[in-house]
Amino acid sequence: MLKLLFIFTSLLSYDSSSLNKELQRVFVTATIYHAVEEQTDSTQNITASGYEINMADPLSDRIIAVSWDLENVYGFKMGDMVYVSGTGVLDGIWFVRDRMNKRFRKRIDFLVPQAMKGGKWENVLINHRRSSGR
């Protein structure tokens, strides 16, 4: 019985680490991009985080690129999981794995297949958990 109590207490303390995080709700402009040299760089199959894109089905990777201010001001980090809403077709869970050009502010880019053309949404909501220490 004591062993079960210890395991249960350990699980509770592990779960409580999520209490040390605060929810960020940020409204951004969202656009799409393709893994092509004209829109990225000469290593279009590798993101800024070093993640290798599934070139046969880039949408399956659920990758977004974020503007620098989302990293520096709002605490977004490479590998973070975010929930995006306000686009309709692209709403859902995405992973921060790429970075946009410094000229963009409060903006995300969805990595999509080349067959998907056009796409710009205003006032897209991103829900993101960040550590309270940032």
Regions found by a protein language model. Give the residues of each.
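Sec-dependent signal peptide recognition
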Residues: M1-I7
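Residue-level signal for alpha-helical transmembrane segments in multi-pass membrane proteins
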Residues: T9-S13
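Solvent-exposed, well-ordered loop and adjacent helix/strand elements within mature globular domains
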Residues: Y14-R134
